[in-house]
Amino acid sequence: IGGDGASYDIGYGGLDHVIASGKDVNILVLDTEVYSNTGGQSSKSSPTASIAKFTAAGKHGKKKDLAAIAMSYGHVYVAYVSHGASQAQLLKAMREAESYHGPSIVIAYSPCINHGLKRGMGKAQEQAKLAVECGYWTLLRYDPRLAQEGKNPLQVDSCLLYTSPS
């Protein structure tokens, strides 16, 4: 378990080495999109134009796409989850990651105090849900086992949660 600072920036080299190795390891990244423990500075996990310490005019670069990098190896289980949006999808992703014999990385959208939530951290679950509902954070699962069965390994879960029946 690690934060986005350790996964996208400072410890990225080690993380990349581990997922490239093919070893059976499970990784959970709590993605706050800023360096939370040191006061909310911008990081490689911060989205374009986001305002944080050291990027008062907005971040110029793109957010590093850790999921796409992991998926590019072809042998890494990858999931984007949001604890407030769907606990069922979160549990499904965690179970799939655990059962996968190889590296897995689950990236969890994690609101933090540095986001300046107007109603406080007591509403973090609600904020995590809103991030998915508005399309900011996509819930997805990439399971290489499906590709071996001739199926699409990428499953987007967000649209399934918020599509109304006709």
Language model regions located:
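Conserved small/polar residues in nucleotide/adenosyl-binding loops
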Residues: 162-166
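DG-centered beta-turn motif at the end of beta-strands
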Residues: 1-8
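Glycine-rich ThDP/TPP pyrophosphate-binding loop and its adjacent helix/strand module
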Residues: 9-26, 30-158
